[in-house]
Amino acid sequence: MRVLILLLMLLLPGLSQAQPGDDLFAPRGATQTDFLPVEKAFRFTWERLDDGQVQLRWQIAPGYYLYQKRLRFDGLDPALQPQLPPGESHSDEFFGESQVYRQSLELTLPAAAAGQLRLGWQGCADAGLCYPPQSQALDLGGTGPAAAGTSGEVAEDQGLAGSLQAGNLAWSLLLFFGLGLLLAFAPCSLPMLPILAGLVVGSGAGPRRGLLLAGSYVLSMALVYAGLGVVAALLGGNLQAWLQQPWLLGSFAALFVFLALPMFGFFELQLPAALRDRLDGLSRGRKGGSLAGAAALGALSGLLVGPCMTAPLAGALLYIAQTGNALHGGLVLFSLGLGIGMPLLLLVTVGSRFLPKPGPWMNLVKGVFGFLFLGTAWILLRPLLGEALWIGLGGALLLVLAYAALHTARGLARHAVLFGAAGCIFGLWGAAMLLGAAAGADDPWRPLQVYAAANRGATPTASAHEAFLTVSQPAELDRQLAAAKAEGQWVLLDYYADWCVSCRIMEKQVFAKPDVLAALQGVRLLRLDVTADNAASRELLHRYQVPGPPSLIWIGPEGEERRARRLTGEVDAGGFLAHWQATRERG
């Protein structure tokens, strides 16, 4: 069996570089000029002065300029419109001869200005990039005309961000701890369970030591999760994309393969003798794994296999980005991380009490967790491999697991039937995955569906690909939105990335459904591809203040976003159809 496992693991380095069509370790979407994010190119601030007037100020970075004719003040009484100062003449490929502002722009609204105001502006860079139109809602207080597209309804992420602003810290921490408990059972959080269980069981730690190890893992995971969330929100960067770079995922997949080797008895993973003796002296007889090692593994889990983009996470990030209150937002994210880790901690520590006392069976358990480590590496490799290649690798892993289970069953007096049945199931499933991979399957749960689809003459995902127009540049998005507005069309913006597992699931289980495609007839479907971590992707994300994919945004026939109807995170077909019907009815 060791030979089979070794051969399987030797495939991983080559497969991790097998992404078709490009160099795996080449930076994606690299450009010759890296432009400033729009919020840094045009820094906007406003304040109400002592005399009641409202001062609006744009600080414009060198090499950038704002268009005079692109300034908008929606919701402001025409009699209160500000007097625009003269600009400098400028001619470019985007708007021809125009008046533009450089360095700074200050405007003053009279004291009578009140209510909801939506500002709009647009600028470009001398180096050749034209940013998409920007907008910001201002609450000037008092009463006044409502800005277009506003209502009392808010999206889930907005509601959570609002609760953070309105509520006290203790309530916010409790709320997000509870949300974390729910997120612990999301599919993208489940890979953390075998990592933590393998750590505790593989160390042979007792109940108390196991609790300390699990606590160290969960605590460090929550700390890293909170820290990265705060950094991402304050810097406005696409941190998800950075953490999903091929070299990083490939490195950590190799690390989990390396961690699996000791579980199969290839070697014993331990510190150098001198350092080990010193630590043994300091620990004074404590048995079990290293707390520092558990903390390091927890940090890696927070980086790579933590929860995906969901409404609670988006709400916390939106709150930090809007208020700049990194301390409050960081504590909330830390509480969310603790909530995610709590069920894992209970399953590993409390569940371990029902296991028999240490003995020869531990070698069997270590082998099980070795396969779980290999499965984690397989999951990490998904964004790097084509779907068929990834499914084929999973099928090979299942066949090796089936052989191991059947081989183990022959040497057991008890539970032989259980292991034999498991081996047969794994073997059949692995064979099905290999057969499906040979035909180009893209769903590991239904690997043979590709043959049924071929008999019908089409694949389910082909219709989904054809229905959506992929957009990766802000200028193309502007053209599509303008065309939809001219035709009075609804628009669905689907933020997507190749490394986003939830995006792929929704592509197959939502947008490939005939009833979903039928319901979306007449809607302009745009897939905003933010796979690459470059200026264009950052602009697409910042356009609607989206923290990351998957996110679904509805644009009405008049060109305004229905912000309260935004969907963040994974949704099933039934939920999506109900949501779209309600959105269409409300207009």
Swiss-Prot record:
GO biological processes: cell redox homeostasis; cytochrome complex assembly
Q: Can you tell me where the transmembrane regions are?
A: 173-193, 217-237, 247-267, 300-320, 331-351, 361-381, 384-404, 417-437
What is the membrane topology here?
Multi-pass membrane protein
User: Which GO MF terms does the UniProt record name?
Assistant: electron transfer activity; protein-disulfide reductase [NAD(P)H] activity; protein-disulfide reductase activity
Asked if the record carries the keyword DNA damage, the reply is no
GO cellular component annotations, sorted alphabetically? plasma membrane
What's the domain of life for this entry? Bacteria
Under the heading CDD domains, the entry gives: DsbDgamma
Supply the SUPFAM superfamilies for this chain: Thiol:disulfide interchange protein DsbD, N-terminal domain (DsbD-alpha), Thioredoxin-like
Cytoplasmic compartment segments = 194-216, 268-299, 352-360, 405-416
Q: Which residues lie on this side of the membrane: Periplasmic?
A: 19-172, 238-246, 321-330, 382-383, 438-587
Q: Which UniProt keywords apply?
A: Cell inner membrane, Cell membrane, Cytochrome c-type biogenesis, Disulfide bond, Electron transport, Membrane, NAD, Oxidoreductase, Redox-active center, Signal, Transmembrane, Transmembrane helix, Transport
Q: For this UniProt entry, what is the primary localization, expressed as one broad class?
A: membrane
Disulfide bond as UniProt keyword: yes
Stored InterPro entries: Cyt_c_assmbl_TM_dom (IPR003834), DsbD_gamma (IPR035671), DsbDN (IPR028250), DsbDN_sf (IPR036929), Thiol_diS_interchange_DbsD (IPR022910), Thioredoxin-like_sf (IPR036249), Thioredoxin_CS (IPR017937), Thioredoxin_domain (IPR013766)
Between which residues do disulfide bridges form?
C124-C130, C188-C308, C500-C503
- UniProt catalytic activity: [protein]-dithiol + NAD(+) = [protein]-disulfide + NADH + H(+); [protein]-dithiol + NADP(+) = [protein]-disulfide + NADPH + H(+)
EC number(s) from the headed UniProt entry: 1.8.1.8
Compartments in which it is found: Cell inner membrane
Question: What is the annotated signal peptide range for this record?
Answer: 1-18
| Residue stretches making up the Thioredoxin domain | 448-585
Function, as annotated: Required to facilitate the formation of correct disulfide bonds in some periplasmic proteins and for the assembly of the periplasmic c-type cytochromes. Acts by transferring electrons from cytoplasmic thioredoxin to the periplasm. This transfer involves a cascade of disulfide bond formation and reduction steps.
PANTHER family associated with the record? THIOL:DISULFIDE INTERCHANGE PROTEIN DSBD
Query: Would you identify the family this protein belongs to, as annotated?
Result: Belongs to the thioredoxin family. DsbD subfamily.
User: This protein is called what?
Assistant: Thiol:disulfide interchange protein DsbD 2
Species of origin? Pseudomonas aeruginosa (strain ATCC 15692 / DSM 22644 / CIP 104116 / JCM 14847 / LMG 12228 / 1C / PRS 101 / PAO1)
